[in-house]
Amino acid sequence: MHNSRTTAGLLRAVLIVVALSGLVIGATGRAEAAPGGPQPVPKVDLSRYLGTWHQLAAIPAPFNLVCARDTRAHYSLGDGGDVVVRNECTTWAGTPNTIIGTAHVVDKKTSAQLRVRFPGIPNQGGPDGPPNYVIVGLGSDYSWAVVTDPSRLSGFVLSRTPALSAKNWRDVRKAIADAGQSDCLYLTSPTTGGLEETVPLCTERS
């Protein structure tokens, strides 16, 4: 059973998503973004991109409401060249949550646009559909990445470590802006060894 603290945390997460949903639509409509969606990075070495990433910030969405903290993505090479995606986090009840899916590289030229699919989610379409995972920012040492989608309604700040340097955070914010998004739409993700609060990224100056 959920205790009162768990229920309060989940309710707070729901209210954040509801409050920001209109802001996301308004902000993306005002963004000075190139037509046809955000520009992916010129080239991704998929072998270097594989491994574990910590989610340090994200645009709230219904599918990640279950996660309270320590959200991570593990990417490994699967059969046929597709990527096996294992997302895990700690829920509001303090229990582990894991979902496993696959990612198919849609843009063979850059390898920066993929189509990610998870089981049990309706209306996803086939693996050869349009991309829904676009890498728009990537550290030269593959220490951080910024990911969105063609509509710019989702967004994730990923890091190899639980915390980023001030310089890397500046690079992350620039990548978000260059993608036609506002860093105020991103909320920091509580991470052991990193940021512990959930606040708009534009107010966090680590």
What are the functions of these language-model segments?
Residues 2-206:
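A beta-rich soluble binding module of mature secreted/lumenal proteins
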